[in-house]
């Protein structure tokens, strides 16, 4: 089996942790900060951070439209927390005028930013995850949740009555941060998706 080259958008967030988790899951991983680097990867992880900031960094780095184009052409992507927000087709509470989070439109979901509350309301807990025998330890930090999932979207996990992990084809998104634990099953799932075996 080949080792896919999976990029991690390295504008903000847990870049190093995702790079390590991807390597441990069997991928060749690299940071992506420029368009040329985006062109080199077989798949992309969009890490957590602050969604309006990352949106505007994508604009400043002239990555927003090239990323939208690659996603539309079928680039597999995994978004964690902010990554889930950005991969969505619609964002509720997107921010103030001129500083909104900009949806990439890769997954047919509507997400609500900061749905679980502010930074002080962050928490972690064990949740069931479709296809995995044992629960996943999920770290939620100012996390979103899914308000609406389209017909082609599979809900993989729920918390507090809302979807917090979804998949649509080769797109995967979680409201939580698996890179902050030693459990590599979510990253392994994404690598398997990229390799066409999940």
Swiss-Prot record:
Pfam families: SNO
GO molecular-function terms, A-Z: glutaminase activity; pyridoxal 5'-phosphate synthase (glutamine hydrolysing) activity
Keyword terms: Glutamine amidotransferase, Hydrolase, Lyase, Pyridoxal phosphate
InterPro entries on file: Class_I_gatase-like, PdxT/SNO, PdxT/SNO_CS
Gene3D superfamilies given in the database record: 3.40.50.880
Protein encoded by which gene: pdxT
Catalytic activity: aldehydo-D-ribose 5-phosphate + D-glyceraldehyde 3-phosphate + L-glutamine = pyridoxal 5'-phosphate + L-glutamate + phosphate + 3 H2O + H(+); L-glutamine + H2O = L-glutamate + NH4(+)
Name this polypeptide is given: Pyridoxal 5'-phosphate synthase subunit PdxT
Superkingdom, natural source: Bacteria
Annotated catalytic residues: 81 (nucleophile), 177 (charge relay system), 179 (charge relay system)
Coiled-coil ranges per UniProt: none
Assembly information from the UniProt record: In the presence of PdxS, forms a dodecamer of heterodimers. Only shows activity in the heterodimer.
Species this chain originates from: Mycobacterium leprae (strain TN)
UniProt pathway: Cofactor biosynthesis; pyridoxal 5'-phosphate biosynthesis
Gene Ontology CC, one term: glutaminase complex
Function: Catalyzes the hydrolysis of glutamine to glutamate and ammonia as part of the biosynthesis of pyridoxal 5'-phosphate. The resulting ammonia molecule is channeled to the active site of PdxS.
GO terms for biological process, alphabetical: glutamine catabolic process; pyridoxal phosphate biosynthetic process; pyridoxine metabolic process
Family: Belongs to the glutaminase PdxT/SNO family.
């Amino acid at each position: 089996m080949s080792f896919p080259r999976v990029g991690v958008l390295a504008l903000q967030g847990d870049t190093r942790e995702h790079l390590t988790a991807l390597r441990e899951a069997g991928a060749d991983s690299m940071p992506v900060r420029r368009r040329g680097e985006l062109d080199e990867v077989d798949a992309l992880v969009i890490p957590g951070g602050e969604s309006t900031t990352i949106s505007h960094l994508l604009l400043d780095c002239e990555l927003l439209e090239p990323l939208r184009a690659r996603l539309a052409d079928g680039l597999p992507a995994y978004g964690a927390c902010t990554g889930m927000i950005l991969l969505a087709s619609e964002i509720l509470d997107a921010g103030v005028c001129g500083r909104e989070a900009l949806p990439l439109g890769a997954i047919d979901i509507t997400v609500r930013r900061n749905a679980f509350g502010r930074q002080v309301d962050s928490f972690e807990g064990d949740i069931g995850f479709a296809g995995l025998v044992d629960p996943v330890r999920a770290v939620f930090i100012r996390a979103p949740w899914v308000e609406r999932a389209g017909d082609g979207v599979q809900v993989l996990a729920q918390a507090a009555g809302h979807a917090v992990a979804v998949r649509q084809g080769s797109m995967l998104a979680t409201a939580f941060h698996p890179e902050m634990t030693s459990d590599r099953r979510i990253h392994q799932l994404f690598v398997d998706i990229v390799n066409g075996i999940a």
